[in-house]
Design a protein with these regions (language model features):
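C-terminal motif of bacterial Sec signal peptides marking the signal peptidase cleavage site
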Residues: 16-19
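Active-site recognition of the HExxH zinc-binding catalytic motif
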Residues: 70, 161-178, 205-206, 258, ...
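Auxiliary, metal-adjacent structural segments of Zn-dependent hydrolase domains
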Residues: 61-156
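Short pre-active-site segment immediately N-terminal to the catalytic Zn-binding motif
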Residues: 146-164, 193-196
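Extracellular mucin-like PTS domains
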Residues: 29-54
Length: 435
């Protein structure tokens, strides 16, 4: 079946771009209109300099100066990517399409999954979960272009920081082709490794943008960034814990991973990580486990039940487990349960009406499988439309309008979630009597 870049992968890569953009004089002012051409290709020779950026009349020249700073601070050559300008709404739409919450590439199945796990209201749309402020632009790795907002006159300090991140992503993509690697991982069904790579990319960009802010911007500009971020946060709705976990993965967890690499081997260690990418989001959360602690391959069990179509499959990973457990239970309990991840495989099945998730998991130790099973049982009771758990062979079944089954055996664990109790039982019975 056709694979798609999954939920959490591109999202972790780019959601830190969400920010307000305006003029230097007034933080909340919209960019003034411009009558310039809508598409511009620019090739800039990069030189290094320690002098502060002056305020050029041409915003393209200002962005070219940012590219020079990227080459200097990130220590990678960079020609300014071809520039495409779009309307403000088109920029937001394109950005949200790039950062969309997708497991399957189909809005219907994605919405069904998020509704089933209690993230999205029954009548809600996936796009409702993504809330971003006005942005100056973003790097589109699929086309290798820098997409800018029409009428861009000048960049605010936060706009400079944001585009520095995007240009850093462009530089690392040019040097290491992380987008091609990410597509290959996704096509192979390894959603978790693709998400791990996106955490490296965004963490790299955010870390070096922080270096730029500290070394190149004035205290006044740094204070303006804080004010802009506060203004943006006030405009955005608070996301569910599931989305918040994905949002934080690149800017916070990925940045910490990059900082760990730099502390031991400098920027050369970061470049080496692109050549030997992290194999799991577990390695991003726990840098000491990179690169030796490789994930365990878990084969999905063949199913003989008829009437179901597979609409998604791959590796779920620690990131998705943390996101799933981010609401409904204590955060400390969720952290403990997700941290023993050793490997897994998941399948999303559709019978024409309802969706079923099957997750087979292997922990580092037997206690990891037990802790996760117990935690998932509590989470299902709190987050899904199910009743109290009842014994069911080796595990517990939770039934109501929806369905959950969870069991563990030594280091292994099985989880079945369904938006319909009958469909859930049909899939759960496929694992009888072993589970």
């Amino acid at each position: 079946m056709k694979r798609f870049i999954p939920m959490g992968c591109v999202l972790a890569l780019a959601l830190s771009l969400a920010a307000c953009a305006g003029s230097r004089d007034e933080i909340t002012q919209e960019f003034l209109p411009d009558t310039g051409p809508t598409t511009t290709s620019v090739s800039t020779t990069i030189t290094t300099s320690s002098t502060p950026i002056t305020a050029p009349v041409d915003p393209i020249a200002e962005i070219g100066e940012l590219a020079s700073r990227v080459a200097e601070i990130r220590e990678l050559p960079l020609d300014l990517p071809p520039i495409e300008t779009r309307s403000a709404q088109e920029v937001l739409d394109g950005y949200q399409a790039l950062t969309g919450l997708s497991l399957t590439g189909d809005d219907r199945f994605d919405a069904e999954f998020l509704q089933m796990v209690g993230v999205l209201e029954d009548d809600g749309a996936v796009a409702d979960l993504l809330s971003v402020c006005s942005i100056p632009g973003y790097y589109d790795p699929a086309t290798g272009t820098l997409v800018l907002r029409e009428g861009l006159i000048e960049l605010t300090p936060l706009g400079q920081k944001n585009l520095f991140e995007e240009l850093t992503a462009a530089a690392t993509d040019t040097a290491h082709d992380w987008w091609g690697t990410m597509q290959s991982l996704s096509a192979a069904g390894d959603a978790d490794a693709a998400a791990a790579l996106s955490g490296l990319v965004r963490g790299d960009a955010v870390f070096h943008a922080g270096q730029y802010v500290e070394s190149q911007l004035t205290p006044t500009d740094r204070f303006a960034i804080t004010l802009e971020q506060i203004s943006c946060d006030q405009q955005r709705s608070n996301p569910p814990g599931y989305v918040a976990e994905l949002e934080a993965f690149g800017p916070e967890i990925g940045r910490a991973f990059v900082e760990d690499l730099i502390s031991t081997g400098g920027v050369s260690a970061v470049d080496a990580a692109y050549r030997t990418p992290p194999q799991s989001t577990e390695q991003i959360y726990h840098p000491a486990r990179y690169p030796a602690d490789r994930p365990v391959a878990v084969d999905p069990q063949a199913l003989t039940v008829t009437g179901f179509t597979e609409v998604g499959a791959g590796v779920f990973g620690e990131l998705q487990l943390r996101a799933l457990l981010s609401d409904g239970i204590l955060s400390s309990q969720a952290l403990q349960a997700a941290s023993g991840w050793g490997g897994d495989s998941y399948r999303l099945l559709w019978d024409g009406t309802d969706l079923v998730l099957v997750l087979r998991y292997e922990g580092d130790e037997a206690r990891d499988a037990r802790e996760l099973a117990e935690t998932l049982g509590g989470w299902a009771s709190a987050s899904m439309n199910v009743g109290s758990g009842r014994p069911d062979n080796t595990g517990l079944a939770f039934e109501g309008q929806e369905y959950a089954f969870v069991a563990h055996n030594e280091v292994a664990m099985l989880l079945v979630l369904s938006s319909d109790a009958r469909a859930g039982r049909d899939i759960r019975d496929e694992f009888w009597p072993d589970w």
